[in-house]
């Protein structure tokens, strides 16, 4: 291998990370990283559409922070003939989605790149004599910078709690498969550029 001929002055480990999409592989790899006191990590990732042997370098964020959000709102059931007697989360979740879209645009304009994707919304069931009393809004949210992403998530949580309280409903917010941002360090990027020119 090339590394055998390079005669490096320190050990180099090539690690294959399984389970990339769920983060499970990172847990396995972290044991070796800690055990061997590995101080620098360079990730290799295939990028479709680019020729084999090309080295693409990002001087900034390679992958955004992300998490799934499952927002479960709990109202009060009522007969479909008397919807005013219950609390239906449908309109609240619909407005909440629009409010989160507006927040996303505001953060993009003032603080940094964030993205919200609607994954799904379920309200009520196919019981036509009963007004909906349960609803779930599912989103995936992303952010280029960890600090901006954390602030964005806090503000989404505040919107959710406020929306539920305003209609006297209870709410649960669950984060699903949270991933940190992959932000590159400038000195490592420069080293990689220099090595790719050899």
Name what the model sees in each region.
Residues 91-198:
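Metal-dependent amide/peptide-bond hydrolase catalytic core
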Residues 1-2:
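Active-site alpha-helical elements of protease catalytic centers
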Residues 6-120, 124-130:
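Histidine/acidic-residue-rich, glycine-tolerant segments that coordinate divalent metal ions
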């Amino acid at each position: 291998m090339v590394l055998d001929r390079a005669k490096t002055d320190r050990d180099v480990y090539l690690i294959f990370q399984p389970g990339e999409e769920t983060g499970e592989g990172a847990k396995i790899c972290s044991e070796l990283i800690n055990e061997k006191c590995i101080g620098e990590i360079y990730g290799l990732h295939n990028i479709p559409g680019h020729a084999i042997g090309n080295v693409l370098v990002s001087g900034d964020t390679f992958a955004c922070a992300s998490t799934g959000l499952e927002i479960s709102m709990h109202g009060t059931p009522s007969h479909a003939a008397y919807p005013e007697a219950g609390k239906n989360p449908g309109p609240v979740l619909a407005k909440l989605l629009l409010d989160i879209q507006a927040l996303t645009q505001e953060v993009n304009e003032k603080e940094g790149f964030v993205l919200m994707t609607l994954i799904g919304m379920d309200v009520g069931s196919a019981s036509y004599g009963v007004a909906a009393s349960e609803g779930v809004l599912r989103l995936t949210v992303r952010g280029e910078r960890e600090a901006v992403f954390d602030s964005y998530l806090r503000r989404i949580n505040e919107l959710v709690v406020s929306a539920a309280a305003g209609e006297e409903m209870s709410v649960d917010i669950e984060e699903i498969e949270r991933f940190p941002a992959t932000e590159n360090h400038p000195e490592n990027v420069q080293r990689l550029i220099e090595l790719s020119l050899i």
